[in-house]
């Protein structure tokens, strides 16, 4: 085991997260490269002096502008919003790593049989009209929904059904207007080789994104995904 002093550990984390020295990433391609090496960046809609994702990138990417992140998410589709740590921005190629989350959401959906008919309505509406937000379709439902994979919950049927379909991976965020999310069918934007690949192994992703992993965190990860044989 490698022994580090507290100072060495601090230096390592600052280097890992690209907070020491000169800029190592430039422009739009630099945004993509940084997020790939970091694993993800958390999205937070609170905007006091800038949203979290924008502040993270501004401090690390030379020449960063907000439009770069929006283009990578909603035009190039090289990145995707994913309900991890509430909402995070991940490289689209990491989609298979989160299949266990989507499986949990599908199992969780069985608690809400009244959603089935409403989900069909959403599918039909998107088929006919394209990407929608919870304001575009008023669904009638009398149930209190709780997400299986993050803190979201509520009694608004339209929002709950869209969030549930988003949690299972059937929908993705097509774009945002301010903090309002618009959803569309994931299969339109994620390549089949990624959309249908089943990878239950997340520990290596979490370790490489954080730069370290303590024993308790690793045990927690093993509760989510077992190591690959051999």
Please identify what each model-predicted range represents:
Residues 1-230:
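Long, low-complexity intrinsically disordered regions
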